[in-house]
């Protein structure tokens, strides 16, 4: 998982060092000591200083104090163990608040001096109430630990699992808390895998089969709770008569692929979804019922949607209470630069897209054209990295070649050509969001004609703007070497 960790009073012993400095200075200023031992804050009523005296001392000394802070018991050891267990460590601190000369380098040097491991250091302004939650969303943080009630509430409001590190000043808040690093480590260890649902139009194109394979090769990251079959109409590749026919064929292909993956135990969690699009789907279906059941059971479930988003929209329509319990990563539409959304997953069910976008669900949108379209590969690359000694790899190569050649009108079309495995993007995003460049934006309005109208004051969603193609394929090909 991707863990966001605050520094002061979470990793560092900020308050204990600050208190020592206040007591020391008070001897020369008043020599009255602590006048209110019940005060929650050192700087608010604990000493009988004036506001001006407090502000002057704090301003003149905070940088010196910050540089010599110690580490809370167990913090370094537990962070090391979390890193070793495969978690990504994001240090997210509000020190870019005008109180320090060079806050980034000061913080980096302190972390290095104390041998604190981290994958990424992020600074925000502590006085910006949304500063941390914006960075959490942009970096796909799964869990945040902080001492600030305000920061934790903002994260919770944006469906980010959050824990308070217990301090005297935050005990009034009814927010899940931990009292030590040992306790935090135990909590994380018990919830390490991401609970996911794959919503897929498996028979529509071959990239769905690559995506399911990638997911099943990444079960160290994912706890797959269901595979739900999304509707699709006749495409350029799949030869289907009706949506219902496509659903049946998607179901069969999914079961066959699970056998080939030696994961037949997952065949019992494959569920058929809508056979009509959102507007005409009056009745529920087993996929929608299962999405609702799983969402209500878990604290957070991520739906990896790589087809028309009908099943997700129907689940939200029937059970809006799940909105705060799910995260949707959807491959669909195009970037704003293209000025159109004539893309297969989007155009099939615009009403479903409108429903999901308007619902305020936690949403990550991976556009197809100009983003996922970068995930192109060739016959020669696949044949090089997918050993034909492995039956599954040979099968994937064969269906890729068959699909690619079906779009060729004459032999010369193969020269210098490639094909995109679009659906790998959604799986890769949840494996490592650092392979993507994303932006937190005001949710666009989806017009009836399928276009976006950009906004400035709606709820926030994440749009992916770019991806690191080589990082994703490197991870995929390495995993495909495993039997």
Regions found by a protein language model. Give the residues of each.
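Substrate-recognition "cap/lid" segment bordering the active-site pocket of phosphatases
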Residues: 97-143, 149-156
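N-terminal acidic, glycine/proline-rich low-complexity segments
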Residues: 190-483
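Structural recognition of alpha->loop->beta junctions
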Residues: 108-124, 173-191, 327, 351, ...
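Asp-based, Mg2+/Mn2+-dependent phosphohydrolase catalytic module
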Residues: 137, 148-192
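Metal-dependent phosphoesterase signature
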Residues: 28-30, 37-77, 87
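Short histidine/acidic/glycine/proline-rich micro-motifs that form metal-
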Residues: 9, 65-66, 94-100, 233-234, ...
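Substrate-recognition element of Asp-dependent hydrolases with the DxDx(T/V) motif
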Residues: 66, 75-107, 122
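Active-site neighborhood of HAD-like aspartate-dependent phosphohydrolases
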Residues: 1-53
